[in-house]
UniProtKB/Swiss-Prot annotation:
The gene is der. This is GTPase Der. One of its GO terms (biological process) is ribosome biogenesis. GTP 1 binds at residues 10-17, 57-61, 119-122. CDD domains: EngA1, EngA2. Pfam families: KH_dom-like, MMR_HSR1. SUPFAM superfamilies: P-loop containing nucleoside triphosphate hydrolases (SSF52540).
Length: 436
């Protein structure tokens, strides 16, 4: 199910990131300490009153070298284009500024609900000063101290009140996949080429997210697919259409709806920071992953080229050791016929369930190979493990003390489970929990 999007907008130093972290709370996933996984948090999942939503800090998307007014204009444009609800953050300490008025005039033209959050109202005496913000013409200002958590509940109430009606669950028998990557890596050509391979019916339909185009098709075996085109990719006339900073949000929306994500890399240009950043989002979201190196026909090759590329990819994407790599050409259709079967296998891995008895046999064998660690004379005891969910496969390991489960031993257990059950192309999550 796709989540509605809430965008946080505002000039620098008004506390957007603090409010972002306060709303996201502990739902922000801990990024692995591996080079290549982004640590800047511009995207997280928020939840309030049993409603989940994607939370975007548009300030983290923008180009810091751009002129000041251009930056905040871009933020507002992104929010108006992509978000279901906009939270416009201003500073109660500084009052209304020219930049606030500039943004408010842009936001005033949108039909998207705008919530005006007056941040840094850190004591009751400051609440009397918020009324100046009525001059922005965006409705009631909400006093907030994101540092202390004061007033954030009122903002969250208003966010939930303005979220679109929840959509019905989508058909789970359909495999949904998306192609993500930098502009000009050949996503459009790959989409057209894939639709020319092993299909029975292909029909473009309006997607469930703003400006997305979904294409449904069925392969020769009767498996239904939905290919999620990056939102807005087929639109024209957008001044920021082919710039990386604006494609970030669109890629994240596509990732959110996908079961399997195809990370497309241009063989002519190699791996860039953007590739690692977006791949990190897909990994943290627990999606199935395939690394697709496109335009393979355009580069000179020898007997060592594939091995060199694979080694470089594994080095740059150390958090994607589970993701298969495939070298393709949208132009010549080289290896494209392998993609549907690969997507199906990864979808099966995402939905795989392991019986507890079989799982615990593997855990006990793993302990025999590598005994549990000790800390200050106390040894970790593993009582049993069980699978609690799929997409991605998630396992809970019940232990005597959670603190004794070092991340390296958890990683060892993950590798043993992978070796036993072949979870191709999908992350798996292991959680240590104290047995009660």
């Amino acid at each position: 199910m796709v989540l509605p999007t809430v965008a946080i907008v505002g000039r620098p130093n008004v506390g957007k990131s603090t409010l972002f972290n306060r709303i996201a709370g502990e739902r922000i996933s801990i990024v692995e300490d591996v080079e290549g996984v982004t640590r800047d948090r511009i995207y997280a999942t928020g939840e309030w009153l049993n409603r989940q939503f994607s939370l975007i800090d548009t300030g983290g998307i923008d180009d810091v070298d751009a002129p000041f007014m251009e930056q905040i204009k871009h933020q507002a444009q992104i929010a108006m284009e992509e978000a279901d609800v906009i939270v416009f953050v201003v500073s109660g300490k500084e009052g209304v500024t020219d930049a606030d008025e500039y943004v408010s005039k842009i936001l005033y033209r949108t039909n998207t609900p705008v919530i005006l959050a007056v941040n840094k109202v850190d004591n009751p005496e400051m609440r009397n000063d918020i009324y100046d913000f009525y001059s922005l013409g965006l409705g009631d200002p909400y006093p907030v101290s994101s540092v202390h958590g004061i007033g954030t509940g009122d903002v969250l109430d208003e966010i939930v009140e303005n979220l679109p009606v929840e959509e019905a669950e989508e058909n789970d028998d359909i495999i949904r996949f998306s192609l993500i990557g930098r502009p000009n890596v050949g996503k459009s050509s790959l989409i057209n080429a894939i639709l020319g391979e092993d299909r029975v019916i292909a029909s473009p339909v309006a997607g469930t997210t703003r400006d997305a185009i979904d294409t449904h098709f069925t392969d020769a075996d009767g498996q239904e697919f939905t290919m999620i085109d990056t939102a807005g990719m087929r639109k024209s006339g957008k001044i920021y259409e082919n710039t990386e900073k604006y494609s970030v949000m669109r890629a994240m929306r596509a990732i959110d709806r996908s079961d399997v994500v195809l990370m497309v890399i241009n063989a002519e240009e190699g791996i860039r920071e953007y590739d690692k950043r977006i791949a990190g989002f897909a990994h943290e979201a627990g999606k199935g992953m395939i690394i697709v190196v496109n335009k393979w026909d355009t580069i000179d090759k020898d007997n060592h080229t594939v091995a060199k590329w694979e080694a470089d990819i594994r080095d740059q994407f150390q958090f994607l050791t589970y993701a298969p790599i495939i070298f393709v050409s949208a132009l010549t259709k080289q290896r494209l016929n392998k993609l549907p079967d690969l997507i199906k296998r990864i979808s099966e891995s995402q939905n795989k369930r392991i019986p507890s008895a079989v799982l615990n046999d593997v855990i006990m064998d793993a302990i025999a190979i590598n005994p549990t660690p000790t800390d200050k004379g106390k040894r970790l005891k593993i009582f049993y493990a069980t699978q609690v969910s799929v997409k991605p496969p998630t396992f809970v390991v019940f232990v005597n003390e959670e603190e004794l489960m070092h991340f390296s031993y958890l990683r060892f257990l993950e590798n043993q489970i992978r070796a036993a059950f072949t979870f191709e192309g999908t992350p798996i999550h292991l959680i240590a929990r104290k047995r009660k």
